[in-house]
Amino acid sequence: MDEREQVYLAALAGLLHDVGKFAQRADAPLREIADAEARRDVKYEHALAGYSFVQDFAGMLTADARRELSGVAYHHAPKSDADERVRLADWLSAGEREELDGAKDDQRVPYLRSAFSRLQGFDGKWYLPLERLRFDYAVLFPRQGEPTEWKDTYRAEYFKLWEKFEAACKPLKTISDPYVYLETLYQRMLEFTWCIPSAYYRSVPDVSLYDHSRMTAGLAACLAQDKRSGAWCRATKNEDEIAILVVGDISGVQDFIYTLASSGAAKTLRGRSFYIQLLTEVVADFMLRELGLPPTNLVYAGGGNFYLLAGVTQKDKLEPLSCEVTRRLVKAHGGALHLTLAYTPLTQGDFQRPRFAEAWRRLHEESLLPAKHRPLGALSEDDMFALVGEPLGTGGDSDHTCSICGAEQQKGEQFEPGESGAETVRKCELCQSFEALGAALARATHLVWLKSPVPIQPAEVHSWQTGLENFGVRVALVDVSKPLEKNNAIPALEGVTLARISSIQEEANERPLNVALGHIPTIRVTRPLAQMVPPGVPTFDALARRSQGVERWGVLRMDVDNLGKLFQHGFEREMENNLTLSRLAALSLSLRFFFEGWLPNLATPQEDDAQDLRNQLYLQYAGGDDLFLVGAWDALPLFAERVQRSFAAYTCGNPYVTLSGGISLADERYPLYQAADDAHEAESAAKGLRDAKNALAFLGQAVPWEQFADVRKHAYELAEWCKDKGAPKALIQTLIEIASAYERDRKLDKPRFGRWTWVSFYQLTRVAARVKDTNVKEGVIAIRDAIHDAMFKPGGVIETIGLAARWAELLSRKQE
């Protein structure tokens, strides 16, 4: 057995070590075990149940491989070095467990508390349902209540889920390759144990069995890779190094995605952002492969960042690997993208509360931050000289310059001419491929990931596929409704060792894919893939024409407020920081489920808002904790409000977990990068409104979310009154002028009793007198009186009526 296989089997034992808890809670029958000594020595029922699972589902692995899995049974009573490694990994991973004070037996019901229910000192009773992972409201969103309400039903729910888990694991019985076995089981564990608490009887049940098991697996792999003996595991001290926590940051992502001309950019933007998502995962996979580590050692990957656990003996490999990744990125993108790698060793003590928070701070502030100040610092002198010494091109020739990204035409490269309105657009081969990727995403039924050999030398990159192939992964977006052999959907299979298939459309038939892939080991992967693409992948001006009122497109950017603070300090309770690796992984995964899995559902008609926004919005990026969306201007604030309301429900109404956003508007010729910058500035204004942030900036004004529904209501009422109910159009302009006068006085620190007070009363009284519709007349008078009240009580309608009026003016403006 080679070292890599032994490392994978250690991870497999770690992944399975507590699977018996799942069976135990479901009252699943145990397999009859003939070895009476084993029954006696295993000691814990869940360990016995885990041993039973191995016997039932790992029969095709070799006898030697199954012996390496003995830690599943004996991690509480080790008999071998392999058992000791699982025991230590379990103990370190369980460092997250926070004792439950004063719990009575009837409170100890095994439901998982939402990761958000206890952040920042909040203490909400919110629990996840026991359901197979799906990106549906009924599955993802927590329910409020006391676990005792479900104490009579939980065993039936567990048994139902266990039966589905066993059925999904049946293919494991036919797998003899430990690498394929591990990856397959890893996916099934995600699907079925993401919602199950690792511990609950004497602990706060806020860490899932999935997160605890994968961290145990990752640590067991590190210990096996470092060849830690049983004696070492038993004798290890508090300051002994156990593993290395590595962070990778692909720098240059924002400029790569958004610094584009408007001409034709809409059709390439989604492809570019999705390429970055794929590239992050592919680079992380490359790092794991080169370090000889299994997928369980990837803590998180998304949005240009990844975290992984490596063995202590791998430290000397990290710098050369960082250099190699950056060399390949530079070959592909000429320095626009590069990898910044940083790491910190983790001692045994770092895994225990409260010390992990300090290790997390050390990784970012003392390692990553200085490294980011040395861009391309990982490159060797020769590689740096080659990059700096490359000719920059002649410049100035628009006929041979890409209209979208500005790249000059290379020798032998075919530029594609096209039209964007009245403007001629020339596209380089890479931008053509990004446009094709965006179009393929809109119609794909499956994402296929093929693990292939890493080329010794990276190839020149003229397509997104080649950029990924340089790291040993071939990716295809497949539409199984069309013959695969005709549309060349599947890349070359030569050298492919493993295929991962993700369903984009749940009901799509996978049989054509199975036939096309032949005998290549195939794994079904559950992964969120945020998809919100209007039919035909419209241009920006086409989106603008779908607006109500003025023809404008716009950009919406949103992200979670104070995310770094949430990770660093969010788990502090009673003067102790309870941040651990498992909690960090769980929080990251929960955010990913919302932004990548649930978010697209919010464009469909909602219970309290029947408007369908799918034809007006084009989601460019959603992942980690943020989103970037292009759309018809009038749909953007409506969608932003839906996101905020849904996020508040998803995060258990925790007032300390919020998000802010900014919206910019643009016409057809406005550059995308400028619209993106404007939206970013608006988002910054929203975050700067108050200490709590939790706001949206729109049309030049930041508004707290708790006031936004009233602003929207007033805006649409005003537009309707002037268009259909006989109110004079001067009403809107009058309100804009009143708000401007108030704002001028406010800046002079004289917000009360200014000229605006009597002007507003006089003019709005005259407007009301001219209106015949009774409801409109009463509405105008109500606004007048609310503004008048601001003389005596600061705030209220006067703060936001100007925004509502500007919004109404744009809604009412005739199409140009």
Give names to the regions the model predicted.
Residues 1-303, 309-816:
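Charged, helix-rich terminal subdomains or tails
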